[in-house]
Each structure stands twice: as structure tokens, then as C-alpha cells.
């Protein structure tokens, strides 16, 4: 199961991070 979340990057811009839920 994969889900993506929006997190703040080091530059302050939102980045998509993919996490694997096994």
C-alpha cells in the first residue's frame, strides 16, 4: 500500500513524499 503526503522541503516549498505501508 502506497500513500503520498505533502511535506515542507528545506527550501520551504511543499514536496511529495511517498511512503510504503507494508
From Swiss-Prot:
One of its GO terms (molecular function) is cysteine-type endopeptidase activity. Transmembrane segments: none annotated. It holds the Pfam family Peptidase_C13. The keyword Hydrolase applies. It catalyses: Hydrolysis of proteins and small molecule substrates at -Asn-|-Xaa- bonds. It is an enzyme of class 3 (hydrolase). Keywords: Hydrolase, Protease, Thiol protease. GO terms for biological process: proteolysis. The keyword Hydrolase applies. Its EC number is 3.4.22.34. Belongs to the peptidase C13 family. This is Hemoglobinase-like protein 2. It comes from Fasciola hepatica (Liver fluke).
Amino acid at each position: 500500500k502506497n500513500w503520498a503526503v505533502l511535506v515542507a522541503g528545506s527550501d520551504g516549498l511543499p514536496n511529495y513524499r511517498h511512503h510504503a505501508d507494508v
